[in-house]
């Protein structure tokens, strides 16, 4: 009886171990879905650096079915921006994450 219990326990732990290894292996091959980078143009209306926001009146954005409007975009540590000021006509890229529009980069356009 003791031997049968040992065999059963060994079998159980062997199956659990192989299952854990199989799950770990599959996680290595899975890739996370990359967020869609959306391009747009508009005019800078203001900055709120304390809240890390920039307000832009943007042209219609077909990729997300948005009409022309004024809205705030979130400035992230990865946002590439320099020399942008209120009133500048800009081209910018952002990623939509839930209700947040995360600004990726922005530059003055002609």
Swiss-Prot record:
It is found in: Periplasm. GO terms for molecular function: metal ion binding. Its main location: periplasm. InterPro entries: CusF_Ec, CusF_sf. Gene3D superfamilies: Copper binding periplasmic protein CusF (2.40.50.320). One of its GO terms (cellular component) is periplasmic space. Pfam families: CusF_Ec. The keyword S-adenosyl-L-methionine does not apply. Keywords: Copper, Metal-binding, Periplasm, Signal. Residues 1-21 form the signal peptide. It comes from the Bacteria. Induction: Transcriptionally regulated by CusR in response to copper and silver ions. Part of a cation efflux system that mediates resistance to copper and silver. Binds one copper per polypeptide. The cus efflux system is composed of CusA, CusB, CusC and CusF. This is Cation efflux system protein CusF. It comes from Escherichia coli O157:H7. The gene is cusF.
